[in-house]
Amino acid sequence: MTDLIRAEGLTKTYGSKTVLDRVDLRVPAGSIVGFVGANGAGKTTTIRALLGLMPLDAGRVVLFGEPFDISSDAATCQRVKGRIGAVLDTCPFVPDLSVKTVGSLMKAAYPTWRADLFEEHLRRFELDPRKKVKEFSRGMGMKLQLACALAHEPDVLLLDEATAGLDPLARDEVLDILRAFVSDENHAVLLSSHITTDLEKIADVIVGIDQGRIVFSLEKDVITDEMGIARCRSAELEDLASSGLYDQNSLRVLRRPYGIDVLVPDRFALARRFPEIPCDKATIEDYLQFVLTGEQA
């Protein structure tokens, strides 16, 4: 599949602190890529770099097949940004503006703006066009950003914690919108989120970042369908590690007060060989925890 977004070696430092460390990232057409990591790991900084909102020390961003960064000329910016819908982690609109005025400003900024589509999303999200931005909760501000992001018919959505502050029903509604968006295989979504259960519902690929460095990039189904968390005692871990069932380097462990949790790459193979060892399906949150804090078996 064609990559609508490609980041190659993105590096950014502030003084002695490296906030992006040779970040590689790709978002193919027709896909939803989930972007996970702890607060301060580099998710928001990466998205800002993709949007050309900050200079980089090294690396490059390629959007829709052409290089793009903060120094791109006005024509390139208009052409590329016109194909991107963005939802940032904080609402960027002037607090004293009404929703209707926000729509008017967006119409002036985007030649492809569709007022009818904007109004449709306002109704869907129950946003009163007469209200001012400052009257909205965090969740309502996210809905307003999403309505704006969709109303100019972009090809890519870059969403930074777009479901934060939403109740479960509203989150499911947003996920339905994203599924519909990528049903057009010329579209794609990059979604950063701490709500990993949302990503388990819709993502195709999960990318993890820690301390500015990409630490994994895997198909979501590999994590949630194939991997498992084995609940072992010390003797069982020794048997498992020495069995030859897995490459020992592929096993990671977390030592708990009640025993040892082991991340295994194939829970079905474990069940066949060691049926006496309890094993649960892995979640994205499990996998991230093992990668960041687990030990090699």
Regions from the language model: what does each represent?
Residues 2-7, 12-197, 201-210, 215:
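ABC transporter nucleotide-binding domains
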Residues 2, 184, 246-248, 271-274:
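Short, well-ordered coil/turn elements that cap or connect secondary structure elements
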